[in-house]
Amino acid sequence: MLATLGVPFDPEAVAFALGSAVELGQRLIVANFVERAPLPLSAMLGYEDLPDPPELARSIAEPARLAHSLGVSVTRLRVKSFHPIPAMLEVVAEQDAGLFVFGPDRSRIMRLRYRRAVRAIRSTVTALVWVAD
């Protein structure tokens, strides 16, 4: 599983996750966890699911496209939550991932948020963990 928190992926994380999925012959889950509060008026008007910015959309789509071209089964997830870090941990547990690659581009994510996520991942996730450092 390759995951980010609403920012583009780190290229090293993509390479590691993709290489591992190809080598192991396992499905690759590409997941983006975003902090979005569902607003009642937005939901009524049909605007609750705004698309990702183009750069982020390309960053999320590229690993999936590459994996698919290499014959790897791919699942793409976009999870919106008030609390994206706990949501990410819940999805990792539900999917029973053997390898979890947390790969947001460090230059695009707030330092405190990244540290919080890494601390939660290391204390909760039972799979092998790769973190972009």
PLM feature spans:
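Structural beta-alpha unit
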Residues: 68-100
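Glycine-rich, Arg-bearing micro-motifs that act as flexible, cationic patches
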Residues: 99-123
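Residue-level detector of structured alpha->beta connecting loops
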Residues: 25, 71, 96, 125-126
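A short acidic, amphipathic alpha-helical/loop segment
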Residues: 15-17, 87-91, 116-117
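A short acidic, glycine-rich active-site loop
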Residues: 47-59
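Short beta-strand elements of ligand-binding domains
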Residues: 31, 102-104, 129-133
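Short, hinge-like loop/turn segments at secondary-structure boundaries
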Residues: 45-49, 93-95, 118-120
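Small/aliphatic-rich secondary-structure junction motif
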Residues: 1-45, 124, 132
